[in-house]
Amino acid sequence: MRNFIVTGTDTEVGKTYVSCLIVKSLREAGINAAGFKPVACGDRQDARLLREAGPKDLTLDELNPVFLRNATCPYVAARLENTKVDEKVILRAYDALSAAHECVVVEGVGGWEVPIGPGRNFSDMAADFKLPVLLVIGNKLGAINHALLTLNAIKERGLECLGIVFNNVKDEWDTACVTNRSMVEEFSDAPILGELIHGQDYMDMDVLLERLH
């Protein structure tokens, strides 16, 4: 089974929420899966949630090798702490997790092009990992543009898009929420893996599992 990256159209669109649902569902299906958060800024809550969804014996440092205290993009946060995002440390941690698990779900930081260092964006790191990418779309006004831009950027990196998960970030639905999915389907060839209502605590894994094998 292949490892993969979870990225989003923006920050706060539900990357951690979807990543945790996937890890939990894979493990319930008998697959030894773990989450991985290469970089966290501000706090480590995302890593804690991934640990709750996955193997409980992993430390936060194993799940999240780079933690920066300022809640901003990794490049700025690292500069404020007079340090840098050490991608070699990240790769070693990823390799260790990958060797011990059947599937590693790599949750990105911020959006696809967020800066992580001088001349380096998250998309550069993703390209180095050479993993397929799952895109989480926060289903709200403006999502179509953000989704198509991100899908095109993933293609430009030569990476496979595993598919799309629409995450309804609010209880209330407006016209955009109702029509975003059909527009993204019309203007892209990425498969829709699922659509989550606000607060949903499970995810149908059938389509994703087919694409991971």
Swiss-Prot record:
Q: Which residues bind ATP?
A: 12-17, 46, 107-110, 167-168
Pathway where it operates? Cofactor biosynthesis; biotin biosynthesis; biotin from 7,8-diaminononanoate: step 1/2
Q: What biological-process GO terms show up in the record? A: biotin biosynthetic process
InterPro entries in the cross-refs: DTB_synth_BioD, P-loop_NTPase
User: What's one GO-annotated cellular component?
Assistant: cytosol
Q: Where in the cell is it found?
A: Cytoplasm
The protein's matches in CDD domains, at most eight in alphabetical order, are given as: DTBS
The top EC class, named as a word, is ligase
- Could you say which cofactors this protein requires? Mg(2+)
| Residues annotated as binding Mg(2+) | 16, 46, 107
Q: List the EC numbers from the record.
A: 6.3.3.3
Disulfide bridges in this chain? none
Its recorded reaction(s) are:
(7R,8S)-7,8-diammoniononanoate + CO2 + ATP = (4R,5S)-dethiobiotin + ADP + phosphate + 3 H(+)
The alphabetical list of record keywords is:
ATP-binding, Biotin biosynthesis, Cytoplasm, Ligase, Magnesium, Metal-binding, Nucleotide-binding
Biological function: Catalyzes a mechanistically unusual reaction, the ATP-dependent insertion of CO2 between the N7 and N8 nitrogen atoms of 7,8-diaminopelargonic acid (DAPA, also called 7,8-diammoniononanoate) to form a ureido ring.
Protein family according to the UniProt entry:
Belongs to the dethiobiotin synthetase family.
What protein am I looking at? ATP-dependent dethiobiotin synthetase BioD
Source species: Akkermansia muciniphila (strain ATCC BAA-835 / DSM 22959 / JCM 33894 / BCRC 81048 / CCUG 64013 / CIP 107961 / Muc)
Query: Which gene holds the coding sequence for this protein?
Result: bioD
